[in-house]
């Protein structure tokens, strides 16, 4: 895959969706979520597993963060996917003239060497949490607690895709999404490169019959579980 810098502005989310489709990170079919719901699409950020691909996705993260206007001093990547995403985003930001530190946590505390659960830059000032998606919000909750315990302030959560999906199971559907719960509980914005709304807009505009055929199933899923 040839690495290209993503555009700025309103086209960013649509370009990201095309990029995710080309990379196989976003796919359509019938998938079962952790909540037991049958989803017509699947987003697997673990497939951003090539150097050029990771460099490109980092550009999307960096451009989205800068465009948000959120003030920040450090990036924090929760283990495990967030580690790579935060470090790659820091590299992309440096290339744009915004050089900041990044840190991440270990799942298990280390009792030798530097010790503890935190690795990397000191958590200070305003910290942006970088991850792939927000499912139940557990990772964000743990990250916020670590950031505050270090004396820093959580400033925002930066993710690739907002599924805009109510919490709960296939039968018991909640009233809010995990993203909305995070924003309400911690009073910080959740910034997404793209959302389910953007995905539907992409499918509406697509000239690809295979993609257009998925539009009805995605729209029905949003009707049932979306916010």
Curated annotation (Swiss-Prot):
One example of a Gene Ontology biological process annotation: 'de novo' pyrimidine nucleobase biosynthetic process
Pfam families found in the cross-reference section: Pribosyltran
Gene3D superfamilies listed in its UniProt record: 3.40.50.2020
Keywords, sorted A to Z: Glycosyltransferase, Magnesium, Pyrimidine biosynthesis, Transferase
Keyword Hydrolase: no
CDD domains per record: PRTases_typeI
Residues annotated to bind orotate: 42-43, 135, 163
Domain of life: Bacteria
Names of the cofactor(s): Mg(2+)
Binding site for 5-phospho-alpha-D-ribose 1-diphosphate: 34, 80-81, 106-107, 110, 112, 131-139
Assembly and binders: Homodimer.
Protein name: Orotate phosphoribosyltransferase
Lineage: Bacteria, Pseudomonadati, Pseudomonadota, Betaproteobacteria, Burkholderiales
